[in-house]
Regions:
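Residues lining hydrophobic/aromatic ligand-binding pockets adjacent to catalytic sites
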Residues: 1-280
């Protein structure tokens, strides 16, 4: 049977002290404890800065060898703009991004066997950035063609109308994962499956992000689930179980903004998948 590894997006939430981390636990102890309960984590610190070698060594020291750490490419590559507005001219541009790309890959490779998928997480692009998907896909094609071998890559876009077969075929040609994001305006994975096969590499990569505006109108702390995502989680579990039966591995990461408390949501999804596979 294929492997389904489920974890959270980041492990550093202080709101988890009590409901997940033991009372009194210090942040420097979080990852070691986390790795005793989950098999994988997605770190977002790499989006904001290229990780130092000492940071990488710290992750290695606090996790077992079979633990998987996925990471985001730096913001300078996928966003490239000042403040909230992306710079479409600089995004993926060799002159502006390849230096950071190389520095990022050199340092992140220090994870060795622990290294999971490296994700190009793009923001939503308006028509003033790209008139349609075509110019973006041209830039993406060139960037992917220049990526070095020896790593697993994934791409996440947040333009719903760009999720089409030609996008999937481009990723498939490079064996790059199509990252499926359960996010405010993006379709569920099973909706994508009705249009085309979203499996473009040797594994599926799913990010359960949620609706930031919706959940922050309810809470801004992350010690418990406050939104019932049972219906969507059941659909994700069905999709992941189907992939496992096709011998396709999966990585799934849950954000606090999805339901309110990522560790519990991740465990809930894991239990549901186990039930489905046991009864199938």
């Amino acid at each position: 049977m294929a492997e389904i590894k489920i974890g959270t997006s980041s492990f550093s939430s202080r709101d988890w002290v009590g409901p997940f981390y033991p009372e009194g636990m210090q942040p420097r102890e979080f990852l070691k404890f986390y790795a005793q309960h989950f098999e994988t984590v997605e770190v977002d610190a790499t989006y904001y800065r290229i990780p130092s070698k000492s940071m990488i060594q710290g992750w290695n020291n606090n996790t077992p060898e079979d633990f998987i750490i996925s990471a985001k490419f730096p913001r300078s590559i996928v966003h490239a703009g000042e403040k909230a507005t992306p710079d479409a001219e600089k995004v993926l541009d060799p002159d502006h991004t390849y230096g950071d790309r190389d520095a990022f890959l050199q340092n992140i490779s220090g994870l060795g066997k622990r290294l999971g998928t490296l994700v190009l997480q793009f923001p939503y692009f308006s028509k003033k950035h790209f008139t349609d998907a075509g110019p973006f896909l041209e830039k993406l094609d060139r960037f992917l063609s220049d990526l070095p071998d020896g790593f697993k890559y994934g791409v996440e876009i947040r333009n719903r109308n760009w999720l089409k077969k030609d996008y999937a075929e481009l990723l498939r040609s490079y064996k790059v994962a199509l990252v499926i994001a359960d996010q405010a305006w993006m379709p569920h994975g099973d909706e994508i499956e009705k249009k085309f096969d979203p499996v473009t590499s040797d594994h599926i990569y799913i990010r359960l992000i949620g609706d930031r505006k919706e959940i922050e109108s309810i809470t801004k702390t992350w010690e418990k689930e406050v939104i019932d995502r049972s219906e969507r989680l059941d659909r994700w579990a069905d999709m992941l179980a189907r992939a496992a039966k096709r011998q396709i591995d999966s990585l799934v990461y849950v954000n606090n903004h999805y339901a309110g408390h990522a560790p519990e949501t991740a465990r809930r999804l894991s239990r549901r998948i186990t039930e489905i596979l046991r009864n199938s």
